[in-house]
Amino acid sequence: GNTDIKICVYKNKNIVKKIRLSTNKVNLKYLKKNLNVLRKYDKKLKQILFCSVVPNCYKKIKNYFKLYFNTNCNELKNLNLSKLLSIKVNSKQIGSDRLANAISVIDNKNNYIVVDFGTATNFDVISANSYNGGVIAPGINLSLENLSKKAFLIPNVKFKKSNNVVGKNTISAINSGFFFGYSGLIDNIIHSIIKQTKKKYKIIFTGGLAKMFKNSLKLKVKIKSNLTTDGVLKAAMYLNK
């Protein structure tokens, strides 16, 4: 992702190892230090599938695995997944993470709205086995950082859920504004999608702040913390059939 990289080792559909890296720290020394633990899986690694939205970072990690594991990485978007997922928009403009999220939920019968809380807050619309498009809104933490940078008297704030709409100090007012503001944004976008498409959807939340907003909607919401990596695994299994 733009902020963090999640690396998961799967065995029989179960995660046996999970590593999180900072995207802006990726270089050979950093990768050797943090990924050396994967060497015990070296001979068992059958396939490495990458879901990248930062091309330069992907190139460095791809070279690392080629050099130290003698294993090639494949980028999800470069694979032919047309029989797995029908893409109804310009595929070149879909981030690999959003594509992986869509692949993760498709079941050929239900409609889904996936909300991914990351650097951006993404909404993706999936009908049966088709990716129909989505909405991109500013990410919460990114917006908080920009507010602090642009407004001299606004401090850096670690975002927390607010129970009171009216804040009693600057920090509580900011948390209130962002929590209730984004709750309204999320609710309005989802209901607008439902109204415009005239369809029923299952709502899936994923990403770092997903649990915080789960109960802010009147609609039923399911949390899937490993949605993206599960989608990558599903694509890998499809290709190995």
Where would I find each of the regions flagged by the language model?
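Conserved phosphate-binding catalytic cores of ATP/NTP-utilizing and phosphoryl-transfer enzymes
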Residues: 82-112, 231-241
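N-terminal glycine/serine-rich phosphate-binding loop of ATP-dependent small-molecule kinases
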Residues: 2-81
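Adenine-nucleotide phosphate-binding core of ATP-dependent small-molecule kinases
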Residues: 18-19, 23-24, 162-199, 214, ...
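Conserved phosphate-binding/catalytic loops in two-lobed NTP-binding clefts
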Residues: 70-82, 218-233
